[in-house]
Amino acid sequence: MSLLDYFKSSKKPATAVTAKERLQIIVAHQRGERDAPDYFPQMKQEIIEVIKKYVHIDPEQVSVQLDKNDNKLSVLELNVTLPEKS
């Protein structure tokens, strides 16, 4: 083992791994939106408005995704980060 091998790290920095995971999520999200029906953006906005009637949320904390599989089955996935109870 040389002195240079000692300073080289075989592990990727945690920030690089986190950035890679985030990029994969963004790419998957954009692919999902590309295949979404024309009414999807309006439906997403209306869902956010309904949630805002009951809970104060940041629209950026709402994720709506439409997934399709080979059996022509569509799944609407909704993830909302709700505020903590005060």
Swiss-Prot record:
Gene transcribed to yield this protein: minE
Protein family according to the UniProt entry: Belongs to the MinE family.
What's in the keyword line of the UniProt record? Cell cycle, Cell division
Q: Name one Pfam family in it.
A: MinE
Q: Which organism is it from?
A: Shewanella woodyi (strain ATCC 51908 / MS32)
An example GO biological process term is:
regulation of division septum assembly
Question: Organism's domain of life?
Answer: Bacteria
Q: Where are the membrane-spanning stretches?
A: none
For this entry, the protein name equals Cell division topological specificity factor
